């Protein structure tokens, strides 16, 4: 079940690096290669940015739209997979700048849904003993998506295969996600008991049945709910300890974005091609591989009392500052 859920943030990562390795065959003179699209750097930048725009729109509207449509976590991730499939098929069959930008916008909508719904889905399914490790799989799926897109793009460019192989891979992943989602995946029991019941579409009996199917005992989840913090009302403010933690996380995330990491993931091939024209795609591939390696340790350390979330976060922030 967890493997199916994390396919959604995989699309987010895939979209980030989807065009990176392809810049060489998109921004060029048509006479240099038959695969060249003849795009300008501004057009390539627009196509890249449309993914971010779509992600911003979807992340802001996902929660209220889901409540309005009585849609649970499963339905939202199925919508994400549908958008990913449409976007990938459109990108695979077009060569015009407008349609490429439209495909990227749709893919961004998928990514926006994924980054909102996936952490909640994992949190509501994870047993308390490994909740931190399960939550880390969200970020691992993102960096795996980034690496896969860079790998497929580098392979297509260096071996002179059609660049359409890159969106075709994401289309295949989306198709698998849809099939498994409709045939096997189940709704989040936490959502059924919480928002689902409030909206009149869920029940405790259905949640218990799903947990039984997943091999989870009710006693485990009773202890989880007993440990969870109370839900605040619309006019209530979070405790001061919450506010301090939220500020720390927000500042760290903003610092991560201002460090320029996204510029590397989106444009490393174009940046490095001016210095290492023949090795630029491989440098980008190495960067994404290191990203995966550094995401693996928290899987084991985040629930370890000797490390925990705070020390890992401080280590990450310190590393960014030193770099």
Regions found by a protein language model. Give the residues of each.
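Intrinsically disordered, low-complexity cytosolic terminal tails
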Residues: 221-225, 231
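Charge-rich, low-complexity intrinsically disordered segments
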Residues: 216-220
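TPR/TPR-like (Sel1-like) alpha-helical repeat modules
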Residues: 208-215
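Alpha-helical transmembrane bundle of multi-pass membrane proteins
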Residues: 1-197, 204, 208, 229-323
């Amino acid at each position: 079940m967890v493997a199916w859920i994390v396919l959604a943030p995989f699309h987010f990562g895939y979209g980030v690096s989807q065009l990176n390795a392809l810049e060489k065959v998109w921004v060029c003179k048509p006479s240099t290669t038959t695969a060249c699209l003849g795009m300008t750097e501004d057009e390539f930048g627009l196509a890249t940015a449309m993914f971010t725009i779509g992600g911003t729109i979807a992340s802001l509207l996902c929660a209220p739209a889901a409540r309005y449509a009585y849609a649970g976590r499963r339905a939202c991730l199925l919508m994400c997979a549908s958008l990913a499939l449409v976007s990938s098929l459109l990108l695979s069959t077009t060569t015009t700048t407008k349609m490429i930008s439209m495909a990227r916008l749709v893919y961004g909508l998928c990514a926006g849904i994924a980054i909102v719904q996936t952490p909640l889905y994992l949190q509501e399914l994870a047993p308390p003993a490994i909740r931190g490790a399960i939550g880390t799989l969200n970020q691992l799926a993102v960096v795996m998506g980034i690496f896969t897109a860079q790998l497929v793009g580098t392979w297509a460019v260096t071996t002179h295969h059609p660049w359409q192989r890159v969106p075709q891979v994401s289309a295949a992943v989306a198709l698998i996600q849809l099939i498994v989602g409709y045939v096997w995946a189940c709704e989040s029991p936490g959502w059924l008991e919480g928002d689902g019941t409030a909206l009149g579409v869920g029940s405790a009996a259905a949640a218990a049945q799903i947990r039984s199917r997943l091999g989870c005992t009710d006693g485990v989840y009773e202890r989880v709910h007993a440990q969870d913090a109370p839900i605040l009302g619309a006019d209530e403010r979070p405790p001061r300890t919450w506010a301090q933690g939220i500020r720390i996380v927000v500042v760290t995330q903003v610092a991560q974005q201002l460090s320029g990491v996204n510029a590397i993931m989106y444009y490393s091939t174009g940046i490095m091609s001016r210095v290492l024209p023949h090795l630029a795609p491989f440098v980008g591939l190495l960067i994404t591989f290191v990203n995966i390696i550094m995401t693996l340790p928290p899987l084991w350390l985040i629930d370890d009392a000797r490390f925990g979330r705070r020390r890992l976060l401080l280590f990450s922030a310190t590393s960014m500052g030193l770099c």
